[in-house]
């Protein structure tokens, strides 16, 4: 009789443990889904910049990344969008840069988080052999990932462009130019720890 009671208690403990694991797993999945679906969306102006113009051809590839190709290319830029920002929100900036001769590749990120695809830039520069000067950049979390990518592939880039961002990798001995742009009234970036 004691053996049966022991087995019942063991099964009960197992089922309670499995139920707790299931509830915690579902809660975690729900939290992740809510988190990645709460992001800054592109406005109408940004979406309009996804259209080709007289001087810029806009191409969307199979990865949903967007390339802005100017008629006369002077350099190339691979751009990582900021965390929880719809990547197409950067289309006006990319289109304007392309109007000024810079071929821009605006990378699509899963869940609007560059950290989920830090190597998203792989292979893009090689698709445009006519571009000799390449730069990589990004905004916020995207800038962190772009700088990290540049640190691993320094020979492929002339520099890194950081918009309200910073590098977690040491870029000082890699021969890369670094342009850092931030607002004096930035409420997120900790300017006292920035330099």
What is each PLM-predicted segment?
Residues 94-114:
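Conserved alpha/beta-hydrolase
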Residues 137-146:
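Gly/Ala-rich beta-loop-alpha elbow adjacent to hydrolase catalytic centers
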Residues 93, 189-195:
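Short alpha-helix in the alpha/beta-hydrolase fold that links the catalytic acid
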Residues 174, 180-182:
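Short beta-strand/loop motif that positions the catalytic acidic residue
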